[in-house]
Amino acid sequence: MPSEAVLGQELLDERRTETRRYKLRFPTREALEASLAIEAVGGAVAVALPERRVISLDVPAAQVSFMAESFEAARQHYGAEIVEDYRYSLEQLDFYNPLAFAPEGEAQQSLDDVIEAIGAPQAWSHSRGEGVVIAIVDTGIDGLRPEFPHYKRHPRSWAANGEDPWTDWQGHGSMCAAIAAGTRSQGGEFDGVAPDAMIMSCRTHFYDTELAAIYDELTSLAREGATVIASNSFGVQSGSPPPVPADSDFIPALDDAIAAGVIVCFSAGNYHHLAGGTPDGHEPNSIWLHKGRSDLLTVGAAKPDGSMWYYSSRGPGQFPGQPLTSPKPDLVGITPPFGRVVYGSNVSVLKDGWGTSGCCPQAAGLIALLQSKRHAEDEPPLSRDQLFDVIRKSSVSLGHHGHSQGAGRLDCEAAVNRI
């Protein structure tokens, strides 16, 4: 039977689906602090960003009209600007659908096979990720899974007010964490790419303000001297170019984190078929928004046989040729059909693989191996540009157009041997 804590978390998650999230931006920090009494009249503060002069409120759907008076008071008395908090989509296939999962007996390959195919075990003689923090910006991580023992959990793991980062509201975040840095050391079923890396769970519902708060925390860690890698598997689920989100705090926070030295990986997206692309086609473009930036690594998805997954988003990115962009994806990971992997509290078999979501943490784990090797040799960490150059140049071409595969399939052994 689920514990009371688990049941309470499930109720919280259910309540989240019945709320609206609003962002309130104030002219000064003092105005923000004075306004927090608004919580007493129907809204619960989910995130506070005092340095950015922003709070976000969860408002039960039934109370939205009631809150109009309170919002108007916030405008008049505190100068607040009020907008609905932008929400990104979980980078998923149809993981909410039970038909996306298959019985254990239908498994063709598992995470072990993927780890072997990308050369991670061969790299472990040089490095296993020690001394590096991998932040999993996702749906949380199931702390009951033995792949995530307490000694691997970063003490500054993050969740919105009232939530626990070591619970997973969907299952997806546990999958990404296991791929990047799960361990068998305490009875886990799988090792990830970097099994000795520290894991920082950053549990989010993908609201702009939550992502800003997470990246502000990652910035602080990096400025304090931590080696931080962020794995992100969310985006905008669309077959056509989405508009740039207005009034974003996440993008400025992302800028700050990258400037502070956080190495950022993003899944390319699972939108190629939504854009009308054929499985073997390298167009049209379906990599959206910030995933085209040159200062982050964008990762697509191939099958173990080297063919591209039908859904893996193709480049070159939404804003090709603009300043600070580069052709995308940078590379691909691999994910098997009917692949067996941690998903939430269970080990499950996913018919259509793990999406680009399951490939992004492979790249994050590889970066952890590279930086950890530098630590072990008493050498300074590689710069972002050095890391990306090593990873691209050591990747194995699968024979596809660059808009599909980038530089090719990542190779942990070759990358570690290159530095």
Residue ranges of model-derived segments:
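Short glycine-/aliphatic-rich beta-strand segments at the starts of folded cytosolic domains
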Residues: 8-26
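Autoinhibitory propeptides
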Residues: 3-4, 12, 32-114, 121-122, ...
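Extracellular S/T/G-rich loop segment that most often corresponds to the catalytic His/Ser-adjacent loop
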Residues: 138-140, 146, 286-372
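Subtilisin-like serine protease catalytic core
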Residues: 122-155, 163-210, 225-227, 259, ...
